Amino acid sequence: MSHTMTPSEIVSELDKHIIGQNKAKKAVAVALRNRWRRQQVAEPLRQEITPKNILMIGPTGVGKTEIARRLAKLADAPFIKIEATKFTEVGYVGRDVDTIVRDLAEMAIKQTRESEMKKVRTKAEDAAEDRLLDVLLPPPRDIGFSQPEEKDSNTRQVFRKKLREGQLDDKDIELEVSAGMPSMDIMGPPGMEDMTEQIRTMFAGLGQGKKARRKMKVKEAFKLLIDEEAAKLVNDEELKHKAIANVEQNGIVFLDEIDKIASRSDIGGGEVSRQGVQRDLLPLVEGTTVNTKYGMIKTDHILFIASGAFHLSKPSDLIPELQGRFPIRVELESLSVQDFEAILTQTDASLTKQYQALLNTEEVNLVFAPDGIRRLAEIAFSVNEKVENIGARRLYTVMERLLEDLSFHASKSSGETVTIDAAYVEERLGDLAGNEDLSRYVL
């Protein structure tokens, strides 16, 4: 979807879910569009055009991760979000950075398989239908006469019609289906994920080709047979090549909490592993070849988007080589009272809409007055300023506290309309917001 969208269309799509942060939205929109532009450039220049990686800097709760989440849905491309803190330097106990590309490859295989199976779904449905009809109506043994065949064909058409209309959905049938090996969870030591995955794949392959008879409803059997027939129609080798090409040309990696692996200039010692992770990330970001079970994957054209709050460290605390690999820097602003108001009312799945929908299930009609919204925004902003700035996440705490009693007694208020105005908010949250000691623990 994203490759046909212009940067302004991508920003409009992000605006539905994220308030403000236009610089960050512009940067990711241009980066996404540049993937498409690069594909239109002729070789050999196309190979020379590498993605410009992005570093998003801003306090927690202002939309860094949300931009990544929404981008993942927009980008019709392999996408993975990982925490930089999960990785350790090669040789230490923990995951090494090559697993990023392996996980991305797994994601691409799954994505490509789903896409290929959708393409052959109609054929798979026809084949599954025939297999079901063979079970429901076994073919006649005596094939010497044409009349029974004709009669059987008519009966088959009647059953086919019933099957399509769902009249046979609850009928029990016995069916021969592929018997996979029972799923086996192998616990491996930290840092040995690759070997563990290979052992798991080896055991999974042992059950291939075996059949087993199972009793089930027609509806369940139809779904199972569609998947089986679609899997037969998909060429695994071709799928693998497509997935690898998709990772190499369109892959996006979102590196969260990158500030946590930055070595602070004012602290000495204990920083070896952090710098080591940065040095391990470096070849991955600038372009290297990683060995995966699906083949070799080049990372030259994978887009990396890193983000961090940088409270205790600065972007300049990252090693110079890594800094140079993130040429686009975007600063995200802290949220204002107006931003909080917009978050509560303007986004597609705003908190107010969520609570209205939840309480509507108990026939409680929740109405948010503009002055009530304003007061909620002021309280969230005030607590963030006084206690700890956790951005938009503060609204979850404030809203839960505000509607706690109403949610608890909702069944008793069935059929009522409750208006959340400034007085209602003040009555339930005013004292807490004003008392810094109380708000520190409660809000």
From Swiss-Prot:
Entry keyword set: ATP-binding, Chaperone, Cytoplasm, Nucleotide-binding
Function: ATPase subunit of a proteasome-like degradation complex; this subunit has chaperone activity. The binding of ATP and its subsequent hydrolysis by HslU are essential for unfolding of protein substrates subsequently hydrolyzed by HslV. HslU recognizes the N-terminal part of its protein substrates and unfolds these before they are guided to HslV for hydrolysis.
Oligomeric and partner information: A double ring-shaped homohexamer of HslV is capped on each side by a ring-shaped HslU homohexamer. The assembly of the HslU/HslV complex is dependent on binding of ATP.
SMART domains from the UniProt entry: AAA (SM00382), ClpB_D2-small (SM01086)
Family: Belongs to the ClpX chaperone family. HslU subfamily.
Regions that span the bilayer: none
Protein name, UniProt field: ATP-dependent protease ATPase subunit HslU
Binding site residues for ATP: I19, G61, V62, G63, K64, T65, E66, D256, E321, R393
Location within or outside the cell: Cytoplasm
The keyword Nucleotide-binding is assigned to this record: yes
Keyword Nucleotide-binding: yes
GO MF annotations, alphabetized: ATP binding; ATP hydrolysis activity; peptidase activity; proteasome-activating activity
A single BP term in Gene Ontology: protein unfolding
Ranges where the record places region Disordered: 139-158
Chief subcellular location: cytoplasm
SUPFAM superfamilies: P-loop containing nucleoside triphosphate hydrolases (SSF52540)
GO cellular component assignments: HslUV protease complex
